[in-house]
């Protein structure tokens, strides 16, 4: 077939990507483009833009696993269209989530005589937020029953200065006073001797860090539990512990199973963690577990009929 000016053809799907008209155009940055782009061209342009980023497989410093088996990746790709929060439409996905909650609660030694409760989250930051909110609501409910004026001053949260930024966000979002126990060269984790200097009747809880980003240390949660146990004997309102196990919550049970940092301790009422701090798991999920239903105020649990479940 002969071609000339009058029957000149444009790009086709077989046209080499860098021979297409679109490949010579800039990717839109402020508004949608006027013309569509072939999917193979769009894929190549975006992939090339990502070439300037770091290589995730060489990342040894931000607690992110960078490899999963091909079958796991395939399963993820095959379920991308599912909105997992729709419990009635995807009941088996919900069942798998429940199994994970059971397994994690078991790893953290949830007492058999209590009714633990937990959920998945989009990451450990959301898990921390939920754990913090539960402490705030529970403190407020108990304080009101004791006749305390819950509006006279801000409630406060105690944590070491090695905290992860999500706790600062939590305190800003929910109007909580953040009380920081300083770390120094002699105390590269929570200084147990100083904790009670920051605790009072308006303390919603103490956050213990099972893995500090800056130092790699664990707070001495067993010692903290003993300290608060004595304090709570005479306190007007008891102070619980939430363990932020984002960094260590899913590997401590394996590397040091005898370490007492979890629900074996009386005053540890909730624990949060990050799923991707566990080996061979991509980023994208977090978990929070409460030792017993009493530590998760009922007003934070929602019955949603159109999504077919409890949130």
Predicted feature descriptions by range:
Residues 218-256:
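Catalytic PLP-binding core of fold-type I/II PLP enzymes
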Residues 130-133, 168-173, 217-220, 251-256, ...:
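Short acidic, glycine/serine/threonine-rich loops at helix termini
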Residues 1-115:
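N-terminal entrance/gating region of PLP-dependent enzymes' catalytic architecture
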Residues 163, 212, 245-249, 277:
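Active-site-proximal loop/turn and secondary-structure-junction residues that shape catalytic pockets
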Residues 254-257, 263-311:
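Active-site C-terminal subdomain of aminotransferase-like
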Residues 94-97, 101-102, 116-150, 166-168:
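Conserved beta-loop-alpha segment that forms the PLP phosphate-binding cup at the N-terminus of a helix
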Residues 122-125, 144-145, 150-226, 260:
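PLP-dependent aminotransferase-class I/II
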């Amino acid at each position: 077939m002969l071609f000339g000016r009058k029957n000149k053809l444009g790009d086709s799907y077989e046209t080499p990507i860098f021979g297409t008209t679109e490949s010579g155009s800039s990717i839109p940055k402020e508004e949608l483009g006027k013309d569509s782009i072939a999917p193979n061209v769009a894929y190549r342009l975006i992939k090339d833009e990502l070439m300037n980023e770091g290589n995730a497989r060489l990342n040894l410093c931000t607690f992110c696993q960078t490899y999963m088996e091909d079958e796991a990746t395939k399963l993820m790709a095959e379920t991308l269209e599912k909105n997992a929060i729709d419990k009635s439409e995807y009941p088996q996905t919900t069942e798998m989530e429940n199994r994970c909650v059971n397994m994690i609660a078991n790893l953290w030694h949830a007492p058999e005589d209590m009714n633990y409760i937990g959920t998945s989250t989009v990451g450990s930051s959301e898990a921390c937020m939920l754990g913090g909110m539960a402490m705030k609501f529970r403190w407020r409910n108990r304080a009101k029953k004791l006749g305390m004026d819950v509006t006279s001053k801000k409630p406060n949260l105690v944590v070491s200065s090695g905290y992860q930024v999500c706790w600062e966000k939590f305190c800003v979002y929910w109007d909580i006073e953040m009380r920081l126990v300083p770390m120094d060269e002699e105390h590269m984790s929570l200084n147990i001797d100083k904790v009670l200097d920051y605790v009072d009747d308006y303390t919603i809880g103490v956050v213990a860090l099972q893995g500090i980003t800056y130092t790699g240390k664990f707070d001495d949660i067993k010692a903290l539990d003993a300290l608060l146990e004595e304090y709570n004997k005479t306190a007007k309102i008891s102070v619980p512990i939430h363990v932020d196990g984002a960094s260590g919550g899913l590997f401590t049970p394996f590397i040091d199973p005898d370490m007492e940092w979890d629900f074996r301790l009386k005053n540890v009422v909730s624990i949060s963690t990050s799923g991707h701090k566990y080996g061979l798991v991509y980023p994208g999920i977090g978990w929070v577990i409460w030792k017993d239903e009493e530590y998760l105020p009922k007003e934070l649990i929602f019955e949603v009929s159109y999504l077919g479940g409890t949130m």
